[in-house]
């Protein structure tokens, strides 16, 4: 295609970072040939968003696309399967429904399997969400652990006020044209005119109405209830428009006692016995039981449990009104929910690699990457396929392998009897037929696989895209670079099991083993 248009794609190394081939190499800022390492995600966005009007002409547009695509997919570093993984992940995120897409992208999945798991988790939560304009205690309480209640109880009335300030009052789907107002929802919990006994009967049945008749809305209830905790949940279908419904779930003990003294025999004192503090243990005057974090529901059979999936939608809605990612990176403005995640991310910019392998001296920016690397020395393969028993060093390799069982298609070679997968059958049969369909245009040499032809062509072009970050020496093959790097690190991964001597290259080990064979003979 490029030849027909008169545009020759830039060499593989042009405009790219030259990096040491290892699992976390994007963190090597200093290895950039141009001195400014660019995040692959940034290059992906630039690749997708490039407009013809931004460049001088068709040749420059094509050249720019080549450059951005290679910075994004990094063919000098990633394998074909890893590149396919990136492409499939991007397309998967693109075709997701809008409500799922935003949630999954926010979690920055690194693989298709991780993205699918996130989408499935949120889909379950959305499927189980009530489509009506009511929220039950069972829907909220049963789905959360005590630890999650603890997190939600930290919310403040301000969240609800901010969420409804711009829209004013919000129509609740399924409740005719009645409206929801923050003060109205809060006041219904303690107002004397609200017929508390009837209200508590509805609470005991597990149903909290979204709107109750209320008194004067001009009173400053925020001062009276400074520690009121509010839950928010999306209600209604996407077509009708979703609505955030606030629900009071905690009132401070001091405010409750104060209100009880003022009301004496009013229904608010009864209600105060059932909605207690979100900051500690509270004793209910009717049953005398201590309830963790002070949450007491009249129906004692309603207890939180550990089903997190059905609460994901609720938690995500709450996060939308919070500062979701308070820890910001000064270099790229990326946000994180936890400080530890920010520290890990910053190593990409600083190039810091605090984790070192004791066997070969190789360093890593993440402890998880070191653990994976160490398995190359120990031979450990902790991930076993339940179908065939084959073991793998990494979970992603197991996931990739398990796809082959989804459509089991294995064939027996008639020539040698070897069992091969359908994807490898034609390649295997070329061994017997002596077929070499890929021919070099310079020297007429033929190859069985296209990748072998590409590697060979570098001997003619002189292209050496793989550079050693220690001494600057360049190589045409990544495998040759890896072997060379062992001269700097001192790594000797190949061990003779007879005498224990170690070697940098497998060929050296084979040559050494002949010594033992000759001595035996």
From Swiss-Prot:
Tissue: Expressed at high level in testis.
Cross-link (Glycyl lysine isopeptide (Lys-Gly) (interchain with G-Cter in SUMO2)): 20, 259, 412
Signal peptide: none
Pfam family, one: SCAN
Coiled coil: none
UniProt KW Transmembrane helix keyword: no
Ranges annotated as C2H2-type zinc finger: 327-349, 355-377, 383-405, 411-432, 438-460, 466-488, 494-516
Domain of life: Eukaryota
Cellular location(s): Nucleus
SMART domains, A to Z: KRAB (SM00349), SCAN (SM00431), ZnF_C2H2 (SM00355)
Region (Disordered) residue spans: 1-45
This protein's GO CC annotations: nucleus
InterPro entries: KRAB (IPR001909), KRAB_dom_sf (IPR036051), SCAN_dom (IPR003309), SCAN_sf (IPR038269), Znf_C2H2_sf (IPR036236), Znf_C2H2_type (IPR013087)
Gene Ontology terms for molecular function: DNA binding; zinc ion binding
Domain spans labelled SCAN box: 38-133
Function field: May be involved in transcriptional regulation.
Recorded family membership: Belongs to the krueppel C2H2-type zinc-finger protein family.
Protein name according to UniProt: Zinc finger protein 394
């Amino acid at each position: 295609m490029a030849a027909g248009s008169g545009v020759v794609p830039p060499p593989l190394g042009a405009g790219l970072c030259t990096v040491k081939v290892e699992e976390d190499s994007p963190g090597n800022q200093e290895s950039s040939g141009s001195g400014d390492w660019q995040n692959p995600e940034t290059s992906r966005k630039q690749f997708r968003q490039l407009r013809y009007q931004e460049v001088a002409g068709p040749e420059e547009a094509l050249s720019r696309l080549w450059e951005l695509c290679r910075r994004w997919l990094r063919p000098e570093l990633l394998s074909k399967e890893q590149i396919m993984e990136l492409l499939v992940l991007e397309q998967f995120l693109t075709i997701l429904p809008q409500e799922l897409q935003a949630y999954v992208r926010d979690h920055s999945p690194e693989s298709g399997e991780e993205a699918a798991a996130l989408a499935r988790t949120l889909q379950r939560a959305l499927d189980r969400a009530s489509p009506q304009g009511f929220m039950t205690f069972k829907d909220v309480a049963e789905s959360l652990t005590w630890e999650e209640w603890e997190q939600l109880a930290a919310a403040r009335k301000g969240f609800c006020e901010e969420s409804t300030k711009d829209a004013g009052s919000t129509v609740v789907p399924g409740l005719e044209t009645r409206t929801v107002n923050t003060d109205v929802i809060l006041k219904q919990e303690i107002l004397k005119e609200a017929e508390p006994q009837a209200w508590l009967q509805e609470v005991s049945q597990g149903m909290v109405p979204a709107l109750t008749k209320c008194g004067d809305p001009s009173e400053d209830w925020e001062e009276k209830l400074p520690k009121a905790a509010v839950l928010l949940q999306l209600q209604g279908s996407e077509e009708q428009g979703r609505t955030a419904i606030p629900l009071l779930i905690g009132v401070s003990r001091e405010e409750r006692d104060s209100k009880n003294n003022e009301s004496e025999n009013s229904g608010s004192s009864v209600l105060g016995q059932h909605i207690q503090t979100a900051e500690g243990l509270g004793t209910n005057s009717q049953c005398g039981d201590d309830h963790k974090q002070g949450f007491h529901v009249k129906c004692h059979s309603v207890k939180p449990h550990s089903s997190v999936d059905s609460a994901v939608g609720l938690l995500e809605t709450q996060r939308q009104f919070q500062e979701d990612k308070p820890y910001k990176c000064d270099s790229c403005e990326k946000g994180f929910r936890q400080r530890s995640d920010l520290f890990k991310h910053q190593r990409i910019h600083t190039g810091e690699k605090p984790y070192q392998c004791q066997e070969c001296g190789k360093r890593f920016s993440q402890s998880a990457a070191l653990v994976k690397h160490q398995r190359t020395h120990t031979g450990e393969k902790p991930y076993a396929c339940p179908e065939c028993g084959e073991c793998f060093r990494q979970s992603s390799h197991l996931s990739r392998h398990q796809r082959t069982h989804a459509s089991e298609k294995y064939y027996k070679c008639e020539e040698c009897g070897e069992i091969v997968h359908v994807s490898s059958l034609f390649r295997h049969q070329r061994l017997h037929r002596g077929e070499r369909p890929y021919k070099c245009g310079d020297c007429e040499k033929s190859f069985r696989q296209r990748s072998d032809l590409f590697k060979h062509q570098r001997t003619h072009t002189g292209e050496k895209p793989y550079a050693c970050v220690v001494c600057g020496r360049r190589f045409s093959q990544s495998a040759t670079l890896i072997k060379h790097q062992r001269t700097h690190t001192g790594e000797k991964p190949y061990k003779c099991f007879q005498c224990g001597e170690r070697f940098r290259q497998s060929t050296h080990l084979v040559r050494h083993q002949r010594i033992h064979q000759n001595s035996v003979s």
